[in-house]
């Protein structure tokens, strides 16, 4: 039997004889074209103490720099271009992986693709929805 499934599908666990061959091949690519606009519309879960991303993007210079996130009394995020709160240093590729939940903040920090303090790392884990990124192009 040959088939395609998405990342983290527990197929091997569900089959009684779980000796199967699994092969992971990247299929879709994602890119955040406008960091500020993306962050302003992102569905954060709750709020956090203010922090700021320090982004490097070699292709889109408007994405380079500081993007601070603060939340108002109604829980609406505001994105400002000034260093408010603790820093989170990463490149655009890592930011995309993080925000699309391809990889969690703690993993990205562990492999040194994201730099921040422990408290801000916990905030990122909490406010970024923990859902599978899934794009189906079969329709």
Feature-to-residue mapping (PLM):
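Intrinsically disordered, low-complexity, positively biased terminal segments
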Residues: 1-139
